[in-house]
Amino acid sequence: MGLTGPEDIDGHDKWIVDMWHDTVRRNDHIYVLGDMIMSDRTTTLYLLGRLKRKGVKIHLIIGNHDKSTYNLTNMFESIDYIKVVDFRASVFDFLPCDLTVAMCHYPMKSWPRKPQGSINLYGHVHANANWIDDGDDLCLNVGLDSPFANFRIVSLRQIADWYSTKLNGLTPREYIEQASIINPQYIR
């Protein structure tokens, strides 16, 4: 395997589809943080059709290798460069608290609702982002070839577990104040 799975494009795309079918359940919402399919438009349409067979809702956060997905808006629930999603503990009982996630293909130094304890999920940098994730910021590389994902699709439960460990018993506000990563005047 190379940085993004098998060495050739066809092998990569087959690997993604096989993993998808082994992991994703009917009606799941899947957030793809870019570089989804690296094939031509015809192959992309075929592969997206195979992925959508399970009735999943695919949200694409555009990456630098997503040219073949341009103008395929009917294949996605949403297409964004940055997507912010609120997950409620009342809906997902495994969440330690309500969780806001700001997703982008690229790591961000500042992201929406960071002062309130939101998480930045990103990909793009492959396995080369430990210097970003090891700090106090609430950002996490969830790219398939990241150490966190370990060549598997990451679930909300895994992200919630990481968040709980990072907070270490604190509320998001307490964590932000204690970590001193935000000037206190910006915390609401």
Each PLM stretch: what is its role?
Residues 1-87:
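Core catalytic region of metal-dependent phosphoesterases/phosphodiesterases
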Residues 15, 21, 182-188:
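Non-catalytic interaction surface on structured domains
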Residues 74-186:
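Conserved beta-sheet core of the metallophosphoesterase superfamily
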